[in-house]
Amino acid sequence: NFVPPYSSGAMEKLEKAGAVVLGKANMDEFAMGGSTETSYFGITKNPWNMEYVPGGSSGGSAAAVAANMAPYALGSDTGGSIRQPCAFCNLTGIKPTYGSVSRYGLMAYASSLDQIGPIGKNVQDCAEILTLISGTDKRDSTSVMERPFDFSDSYREDLKGMKIGIPINYFGSGINHEVREKILAGAGVLRGLGAELQEFEMPGIEYAVPAYYIVACAEASSNLSRYDGIKYGFRSKNVKDLRETYYKSRSEGFGSEAKRRIMLGSFVLSSGYFDAYYKKALQVRTMIKENFNKAFEKYDMILSPVSPTAAYKIGEQISDPLAMYMADIYTVSVNLAGIPAVALPCGISDENNMPVGMQLIGNNFSEPALVKAAYAFQQVTNFHKRGGIL
């Protein structure tokens, strides 16, 4: 029942435009997770099938929209936390260019990766919300857009002349065969709309997940150090002195996944391991950005999976953190590079009758082009119109 003392920059803009705030949605603790199973408040269930996870970390936002509790929602995307829930819940979501939407009021997980974006039933709804929340904010030093996005030229069905790259190594042995087939079928739809598709090799994907978790956890260990029970956050009641206040407040106030990432971040930032891990991760991050830059010299955008599988059952991965981390393999590189991506539905799995999503990745501030491609796709398909059991 906590009521925030102030609104975020994104919410201020929505309320100014007349939006009605229905409530706060469940999510993984401090955005650390991909299923909402790490949430302090309990697990959110996927409206398509209550035995399955809705994705995360913004799983509550996605579930609310999928269950028709709200026409749209906001989420935060640090390594895929908007796009993966959209893929699992048959929704559309936009992870905007870093700096295009104010992070003022967003509880920081990894400050150089976090970005707020919309979740909705279709890309036009998401684009309208992104128009409202994008633009400059002096309270966020990373805010770089002087004007909001303009999508007025994006609502066309003709993609003639648009060049889309397909990184063929993204579709190797690690991806579920049905997910691969649905996404490649979606590529065929884009080709039918006039887009030129070409396969290519995107180097460096094997380094994306370890580099991401080193950078993200390092920043998290710093950002979450403020939760000490004195200056900020939960305070344990049964304490004898200041030291015990710090110790018990942090021990009792953080869940196991948050503790794991804080410890990992503290480890890679320590003097003995800084060069061996953190410095190398930053070098990999630069390499990933350069690889995207080279790809965008040839292609207007890249078509990629969101997740190697469709949604999985509750409890299947929570005991195996490494498996959960590796599920982010297709999304984290976008955050490391700071570029935008749109996730949208492209089919239903025959194995478990759960949704399958794909993503379109673009260069900095290419959201209008991404929306154009996604809009054209959704005009000739009905995947986004299908609903689950609710």
Pin down the residues of each PLM region.
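Conserved alpha-helical elements of sugar-nucleotide-dependent glycosyltransferases
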Residues: 6, 175-182, 326, 369
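General small-molecule cofactor/ligand-binding pocket signal
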Residues: 22, 196-201
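Serine-dependent amide/ester hydrolase catalytic core
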Residues: 26, 170-172, 205, 228-336, ...
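Short glycine/threonine-rich loop-to-helix capping motif typified by GTGT followed
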Residues: 177-179, 209-218, 313-319
